[in-house]
């Protein structure tokens, strides 16, 4: 049985963590990007399907290309952030299941079932996106998850010729506290929960 994390860890992951609109002028390294993946890949997905595909926009050219396909306010955030990740979902994730889930023929569950493929890819890449945020926070980085972009245009610009579609985008770096406002309310347990 695992021991509960201490308050400092919970604060870093949740209670004191924020979604940032701006970042300090401090670079994020390739090693840190790899560390994020090497942590987040252990988060559970259905049949270990791991449908998320990430493009890390690190260069000025890549960030400008992405920013042009977003709402203006989001584009500004992308241009200012050290890195922005495009969290995509591979609609052919099931082709990897013989390797990733070898103890049964999980691939056959999905072949020809487009509705199940799309639901599974979206749900599990969204889960992986959440693991991405928590992994980044655990490694001392900050994030800013966003929609507010032209999905079809992003897919054409970054995933052309593949079966990958964009889910959401997320800036990454060392957050500038001057870029955020006071935290919005988080209601108590009884407001949104029922125990039956």
Give residue spans per PLM region.
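A glycine-rich helix N-cap at a beta->alpha junction
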Residues: 75-78, 83-87, 160-181
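Short Asp/Glu-rich motifs
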Residues: 32, 59, 155-156, 163
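Acidic, glycine-rich active-site loops and adjacent beta-strand->loop/helix elements
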Residues: 91, 149-152, 176
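Short Gly/aromatic-enriched secondary-structure transition segments
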Residues: 53, 99-103
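Small-aliphatic-rich amphipathic alpha-helix that forms the alpha element of a beta-alpha
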Residues: 40-42, 85, 105-157
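C-terminal helix-cap and adjacent tail motif
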Residues: 2, 10-13, 19-20, 93, ...
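N-terminal amphipathic, basic helical "cap/leader" segment at the start of enzyme domains
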Residues: 1-94, 194-196
